[in-house]
Amino acid sequence: MCIRDRSVLDYSSMDPMIYSIIGQLAMFLPLILIGPKMFYENPKTTFSIYKISVGDVIAAIALTFAIGPITSLLSLITSIFFPNVVSTDLATAYQSPFIYSVISICIIPAVCEELIFRGVVFSGFKNLSLKKACILGGIIFSIAHFDPQQSLYTFAVGVLFCYIVYRTKSVFPGMISHFCLNFSQLMFSRISFSLTAADTAAGEIVMTDALMAQYVLQYLFLSVFSIPIILYLVSLMGRKYGRGKPLFAKLLMPKKEFVIEDESVFDYAPQQQYEEKFFDWQLILILILYILFILLL
């Protein structure tokens, strides 16, 4: 999941991935720099930059494999109605040096998108209920990709990653999962293109209705088993902040006490002194600037 470069400029002599790297940095860095200033907060608070446990790291990596079938299923469903432009982007990446592709498709989106959408944007929703904050965060993340084909799975992942930030009080688990998810897509595409280069030179894979139906059924079957795994992995995250016990805790550890180590954790809930609202002027300005960057680059 990376936001596609919409530039109308032509740098024919420049590697496409280098141009993508420059475009993404030009788009993301100003927003990251002004985000904390807009909310008058410490950058550590705005971006939710807090240490996580080794268990959270392992759970974040495992979560990548668990959500894979669901993201693939949602991507297939939307590709029935909209062209899959991501395959074209991955075909372009196949022609570029591997390290450029990793930086452009995996590292920059994982770091910058999480800082902006699960940092600046999500922290702006602290006066909403957790459910509203996560859903709105997912909607904005989906819209920001400007790609209908990616809309369903980016929304689902956006909601999930927002909830993970709430549980762990950190953007790092989301960054790890985001990187692993994009990296797995990149590796899968490179292997596929290398095996069937003649059929995928233009980034388009010919898929019959029967083959599409077969893939949908396969991923639907896998998704049924993935959902409880996802719920369990997420429930293991953020336990040091008292974000609830892991699933099946009563069966596995009936006598274990879970202590809240940080009493200052700020829950996403309407505060009495503030009116609950989806947007304030700072967040609206951030989104306007973001859209302008997308259109101008």
Named regions from a protein language model:
Residues 65-69, 88-151, 156:
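Function-critical hydrophobic alpha-helical transmembrane segments in multi-pass membrane proteins
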Residues 11, 15-19, 44-112:
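Juxtamembrane helix-loop-helix connectors linking adjacent transmembrane helices
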